[in-house]
Amino acid sequence: MITHLKNWPRLLNRFVLQLKNARHSIHQFTHLAGRLQRPPKSGKSSRDPYLVTAVQGRSKKPRYPGERANQRFGEDSWFVSSTPLAEVMGVADGVGGWRDVGVDAGRFAKELMTCCSGQTQRSGFDGRSARNLLIAGFQELTHREQPVVGSSTACLATMHRRDCILYTANLGDSGFLVVRNGRVLHRSVEQTHDFNTPYQLTVPPADRQDCYYCDKPEMAVSTRHSLLPGDLVLLATDGLFDNMPESMLLKILNGLKERGERDLLQGASQVVEKARELSLNATFQSPFAIKARQHNVPYSGGGKPDDITLILASVEVPRA
């Protein structure tokens, strides 16, 4: 994500010395990692549907130490959580403009996902409102004794097992797809203030409580969709959607012969690898290049190098 921050002069002065002393590597480094999420073996009805989930991602720049363990791909973050009542997953994309003032742009996204994941383990959480989960997670983050300064988009999805209904909340330009029988059944809609300036949750510095883009979690678009066994649910940051057309994404997903854990991981890996390849292609007419032209924004064309995070899940039912 490339978003310009405005009206932060005091913050800029505070961190300018850090920026002068920082050493930046100019070579490009990408990292691929995957994770399989198995259904819980206890705490739920043996007849309830569940999600088999794979996570893949690439960071476009050198990783921070311990990034993989911290569930980060560059400035993106994610989480997957299972409870007796629901399956939950989320992605967040830290606003890159904070790098210009010496702030780790990915930390805010990581801490937001950590708070949302923690909220799923609280009593009373039933997975029927992804937006309420986002609200609760953001409130927890903003009430920390030591503020985590930054901004990020967020996309959360919860599947209530008994109802087999997917509840989503999307704020910004990350998003989700529901695929059934080879076709996109539902797709999220971007929320943007302007071209390449998505809605974003923000915690400003203590001395700058007025902020330029301080959107509220209540502004997230909330949807619900009935799911069937075999449906695919995909969550991703804009590093995927800005570089890969929907038709190309479907071609890869429709090539999955099975929906087992390793099959999903292989499919997710293929999607991420292809998106990364397209992001580095200077002549490919990417979705990002097309949007730039539609907004009369000068852009030479090609993909948009960015962090990519993808969660791919399949709806399954226990075998008798």
From Swiss-Prot:
Reactions catalysed, as given in the entry: O-phospho-L-seryl-[protein] + H2O = L-seryl-[protein] + phosphate; O-phospho-L-threonyl-[protein] + H2O = L-threonyl-[protein] + phosphate
Residue intervals of the PPM-type phosphatase domain: 49-315
MF (Gene Ontology): metal ion binding; protein serine/threonine phosphatase activity
Any one GO cellular component localisation term in the record: mitochondrion
Binding residues for Mn(2+) 2: 93, 238
Key words of the record: Hydrolase, Magnesium, Manganese, Metal-binding, Protein phosphatase
Enzyme class: hydrolase
Amino acids binding Mn(2+) 1: 93-94
Any one biological process term the GO annotation gives: dephosphorylation
EC number: 3.1.3.16
Cofactor dependence: Mg(2+); Mn(2+)
Short name of any one Pfam family annotated for the protein: PP2C_2
Keyword Protein biosynthesis: no
Domain of life, per lineage: Eukaryota
Similarity-based family: Belongs to the PP2C family.
Entry protein name: Protein phosphatase PTC7 homolog fig
Gene: fig
